[in-house]
């Protein structure tokens, strides 16, 4: 019936936030807890979750979400949680607590063993979905600032479920040739909506390149294209910008996104605001990169601030016309090696709402000048 139904603006997407209780402002949007709770409550057949790690019991709200998942799994709802092979530290405890939930570890890069599953998304019944930067941890649900998108528009949920199928094909318990065969079966139906065919102004982008499949857009290509075509403004709220790729303990320069930001400021006079995180999960290069951008563009309209409370929001807005929400840092290692799905939209309402979030964060008491 989808081809004959009118497509709602923004594909019925709503922004979703987690805000720690010690912040000096509150959100007008659905909370991550409310979003996950609604997905669980409305599920009739299945709930699929992809996350680097799974540690929901670390906070009270995370534990409540996990208990609800356990409850519906006991009633026959199929629950599958994908997590990275290197993020399974709490797996034994969770399996003993909830035997009806199927936990699957994946290794998306058995050949080189450098790629991780970074994707943070939920899909249920091919009807509802969440994608953003909230992993399936108690912190992301309760105590760490995150941003994501919830939609109950079935075509969009179905398209995201295709990504789940692809990641699931890299089950680390399978032999490599089975992984390849399984993944190959996913590729022909890998996506329906992309930058040239958005639905309601919305589409997904993917990483890394070897997992793209048929007609998917590489996240790096879209981000860099948007940065290079920016005319008036670029607003970035990210945990880190790191112009390197790490392989076997060695660092290699990866300036693609970094250079695109500098070129926009110096060559085209684009107004750029960069709000970076500053907590113990940051890469050692992150603050150095922020300072170098500030120094190189001292004669240009580029401003850098540091967010002082744990902030895993990863948001890009270009020319007030395009919004990008992802689970990856602007980091060469993430973009070259790791597996994730990003949300993109040119819908005016969604871009406007995301812009208001950035403006709120930018002027808040938690945002400090880099020079202080």
Curated annotation (Swiss-Prot):
According to its UniProt record, what is one Pfam family this protein matches? PLDc_3
Summary of the function given for this chain in its UniProt record: Major envelope protein that plays a role in the biogenesis of the viral double membrane and in egress of virus from the host cell. Produces the wrapped form of virus that is required for cell-to-cell spread. Acts as a lipase with broad specificity including phospholipase C, phospholipase A, and triacylglycerol lipase activities.
Name of protein: Envelope phospholipase OPG057
User: What is the UniProt domain comment for this protein?
Assistant: Late-budding domains (L domains) are short sequence motifs essential for viral particle budding. They recruit proteins of the host ESCRT machinery (Endosomal Sorting Complex Required for Transport) or ESCRT-associated proteins. F13 contains one L domain: a YPPL motif, which might interact with PDCD6IP/AIP1.
Q: Name one GO biological process term.
A: viral budding via host ESCRT complex
SMART domains registered for this protein in UniProt = PLDc
Organism of origin is Monkeypox virus
List cellular component terms (GO): host cell endoplasmic reticulum membrane; host cell Golgi apparatus; membrane; viral envelope; virion membrane
| Motif annotated as YPPL, chain positions | 153-156
What's the chief localization of this chain?
virion
Q: Which family does it belong to?
A: Belongs to the orthopoxvirus OPG057 family.
Kindly report, in one word, the top-level EC class recorded for this enzyme.
hydrolase
> Which UniProt key words apply to this protein?
Host endoplasmic reticulum, Host Golgi apparatus, Host membrane, Host-virus interaction, Hydrolase, Late protein, Lipoprotein, Membrane, Palmitate, Viral budding, Viral budding via the host ESCRT complexes, Viral envelope protein, Viral release from host cell, Virion
* Lipid modification (S-palmitoyl cysteine), residues: 185-186
């Amino acid at each position: 019936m989808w081809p004959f139904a009118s497509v709602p603006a923004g594909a019925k997407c709503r922004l979703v936030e987690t805000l720690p209780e010690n912040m000096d402002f509150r959100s007008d949007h659905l909370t991550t807890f409310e979003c996950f709770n609604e997905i669980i409550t409305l599920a009739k057949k299945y709930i699929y979750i992809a996350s680097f790690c799974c540690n929901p019991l670390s906070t009270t709200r995370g534990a409540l979400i996990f208990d609800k998942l356990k409850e519906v799994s006991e009633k026959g709802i199929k629950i599958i949680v994908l997590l990275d092979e290197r993020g399974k530290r709490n797996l034994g405890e969770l399996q003993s607590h909830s035997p009806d939930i199927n936990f699957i570890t994946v290794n998306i890069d058995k050949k080189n063993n450098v790629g991780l599953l970074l994707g943070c998304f939920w899909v249920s019944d091919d009807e509802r979905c969440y994608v953003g930067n909230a992993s399936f941890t108690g912190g992301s649900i309760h105590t760490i600032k995150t941003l994501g998108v919830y939609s109950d528009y079935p075509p969009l949920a179905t398209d995201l479920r295709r990504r789940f199928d692809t990641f699931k094909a890299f089950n680390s318990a399978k032999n490599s040739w089975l992984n390849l065969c399984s993944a190959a079966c996913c590729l022909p139906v890998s996506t329906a909506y992309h930058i040239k065919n958005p639905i309601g102004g919305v589409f997904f982008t993917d990483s890394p390149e070897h997992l793209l499949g048929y007609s998917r857009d590489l996240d790096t290509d879209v981000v860099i294209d948007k940065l290079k075509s920016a005319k008036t403004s670029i607003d970035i709220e990210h945990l880190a910008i790191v112009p390197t790729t790490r392989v076997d303990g060695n660092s290699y320069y990866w300036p693609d996104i970094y250079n695109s930001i500098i070129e926009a400021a110096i060559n085209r006079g684009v107004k750029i605001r960069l709000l970076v995180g500053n907590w113990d999960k940051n890469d050692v290069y992150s603050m150095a990169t922020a300072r170098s951008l500030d120094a190189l563009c001292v004669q240009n309209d580029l401003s850098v601030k540091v967010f002082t409370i744990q902030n895993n929001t990863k948001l890009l807005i270009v020319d007030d016309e395009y919004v990008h929400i992802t689970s990856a840092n602007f980091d060469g290692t993430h973009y070259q090696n790791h597996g994730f799905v990003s949300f993109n939209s040119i819908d005016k309402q969604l871009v406007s709402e995301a812009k208001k979030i950035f403006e709120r964060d930018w002027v808040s008491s938690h945002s400090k000048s880099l020079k202080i």
